[in-house]
């Protein structure tokens, strides 16, 4: 479960390393974000000499959460950390590589470009 003020790792090579969630896109009173949800975040740590800089406000899609994800067939998926992929306004990733395994549920939310860049789909 991701809520405002939650710190996230970045799972791509866009130039950001750490993010902090400041808003969850969706209903006005939405409290938590899960895998596949879009959040507004601020960059807390960035790689030097990249287009993304510290304190820049961006959009990101959640790809890993510590909160377990339960599927209808009984499988439970749980990650060790919270992570996101930086996206643009159209929903395309800003990076060209993704470094972690991605849950199959992202395909249902029309993030097919992120799924195609992932090295493994769980």
Swiss-Prot record:
**Name of the featured protein:** Large ribosomal subunit protein uL14c
Localization, UniProt = Plastid, Chloroplast
Any idea which UniProt keywords this protein has?
Chloroplast, Plastid, Ribonucleoprotein, Ribosomal protein, RNA-binding, rRNA-binding
Q: What does this protein do?
A: Binds to 23S rRNA.
Where along the sequence do coiled-coil regions lie?
Answer: none
Q: Name one Pfam family in it.
A: Ribosomal_L14
Q: Which GO terms describe its molecular function?
A: large ribosomal subunit rRNA binding; structural constituent of ribosome
**Annotated GO CC locations:** chloroplast; cytosolic large ribosomal subunit
Tell me the GO BP annotations in alphabetical order: translation
Summarize subunit and interaction data from the UniProt record for this chain: Part of the 50S ribosomal subunit.
What's the domain of life for this entry? Answer: Eukaryota
Q: Which family does it belong to?
A: Belongs to the universal ribosomal protein uL14 family.
Gene3D superfamilies per UniProt? Ribosomal protein L14
NCBIfam families in the cross-refs: rplN_bact
PROSITE patterns recorded: RIBOSOMAL_L14 (PS00049)
